[in-house]
Amino acid sequence: MYIDFDGMQTKNLPNFKGGEKVFKADMFDDGDTKIMRGILESGASIGLHTHEGNCEIIYILSGNGKVKYDDTEERLSAGSCHYCPKGHSHSLINDSEEDLVFFAVVPELR
């Protein structure tokens, strides 16, 4: 299945999951899996949240930032991949001067 992120209406999600500023997302959701291209501008973040019935894979396309994962902190840059398994918590933070652009997949686990 082809997914055209450029042809999608971008969703602007302010203070997403309790984060700072606006999370911009081009998102495909078939009810079982969310597949998205996301953008966090400088100083923006996705707030700390727990994946109860799903997991998340984040691949950084461009920019730099960090993930708070459970009790640790991880630096991310273009080419980095972060995995948050079911039952774990994380947040994504753009602490750089440029946009943080990423690809993410969130499959529901049954």
Regions found by a protein language model. Name each.
Residues 72-86:
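Short acidic-glycine-tyrosine-enriched beta hairpin
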Residues 1-32, 47:
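A short, N-terminal "cap"/entry segment at the start of jelly-roll beta-barrel domains
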Residues 45-47, 66, 82, 86-92:
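Histidine-centered metal-chelating micro-motifs
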